[in-house]
Curated annotation (Swiss-Prot):
Enzyme class: lyase
Gene: pyrF
Gene Ontology biological-process entries: 'de novo' pyrimidine nucleobase biosynthetic process; 'de novo' UMP biosynthetic process
Active site: K66 (proton donor)
Short name of any one Pfam family annotated for the protein: OMPdecase
Protein purpose: Catalyzes the decarboxylation of orotidine 5'-monophosphate (OMP) to uridine 5'-monophosphate (UMP).
PANTHER family: OROTIDINE 5'-PHOSPHATE DECARBOXYLASE
EC number: 4.1.1.23
Pathway: Pyrimidine metabolism; UMP biosynthesis via de novo pathway; UMP from orotate: step 2/2
SMART domains: OMPdecase (SM00934)
Any one Gene Ontology molecular-function term assigned to this protein's record: orotidine-5'-phosphate decarboxylase activity
Family annotation (InterPro entries): Aldolase_TIM, OMPdecase, OMPdecase_AS, OMPdecase_bac, OMPdeCOase_dom, RibuloseP-bd_barrel
Protein name, per record: Orotidine 5'-phosphate decarboxylase
């Protein structure tokens, strides 16, 4: 794997709440990572301008808003995301097949295949444990639920899933080589675990079959964020040779 290929797998999580910080990070890292994640805090604070701020620096955007609502509402939200020009957008697989199908159909109807956003379904959050699932009435093991939701997502027209790195291999086996797998819960060897429960190193995740890695604090909190991003690229390249 080349350094450029490894770099393009990194999605930097913009865990900020204002446009000035977006400009700072996008300018600093646009050549060091493949994409920027705009999540709930940032989008609630800055709105669509957050996406435009990233694109101003030639950055691609993963709009991480995890839609979960009635099918028509989610379909309209995905159309709005597509009009913003984001590369990836997501919803919760637990919203069910009709919700996912409506979103997929709406996006494919309005946009060409090359221009449309790729739609991802969130399976089980990486902060969740077996106890978390039991508390909300889900008795199935985490991995079983993740694979079940991933298969449902594929059948419902999703392009891929967001899932813990520990479930990558099972998802790949169940859903095939062309199904996108985006994984948070990735921590390079030099970083702290923080609040993610089911984790791997970047190299381990890529080797297991991840297409994209969502990484925030290990880069943002580093003394030298640019160097941290480069070290992660080094780890990936060295680990998958």
């Amino acid at each position: 794997m080349t350094r450029d290929e490894a770099k393009n797998k990194i999605i930097f999580a913009l865990d900020v709440d204002n446009l000035k910080d977006i400009d700072c990070w996008a300018e600093k890292l646009s050549r060091k990572v493949g994409m920027f994640k705009v999540g709930k805090e940032l989008f609630t604070s800055a709105g669509p301008a957050a996406v435009e701020a990233v694109k101003k620096h030639a950055g691609e955007v993963f709009l991480d808003l995890k839609y979960h609502d009635i099918p028509n509402t989610v379909a309209q939200a995905m159309l709005a995301a597509g009009r913003l020009g984001v590369k990836l957008a997501n919803l919760h697989a637990l919203g069910g097949p009709e919700m996912m199908e409506k979103a997929s159909q709406a996006v494919r109807k309005e946009f060409s295949e090359n221009e449309r956003p790729r739609l991802l379904a969130v399976t089980i959050l990486t902060s969740s444990t077996q106890d978390t699932l039991k508390a909300v009435g889900i008795e199935h093991p985490v991995e079983e639920m993740v694979v079940r939701l991933a298969k449902l997502a594929k059948e419902s027209g999703m392009d891929g899933v967001v899932a813990s790195p520990l479930e990558i291999e099972a998802i790949r086996a169940a859903c095939g080589p062309d199904f996108l797998i985006v994984t948070p819960g990735v921590r390079p060897s030099f970083a702290a675990v923080d609040d993610q429960k089911r984790i791997m190193t970047p190299a381990e995740a890529v080797k297991a079959g991840a297409d994209y890695l969502v990484i925030g604090r290990p880069i943002a909190k580093a003394a030298d964020p640019i160097q941290a991003a480069e070290l992660i690229v080094d780890e990936i390249v060295a680990g998958v040779q």
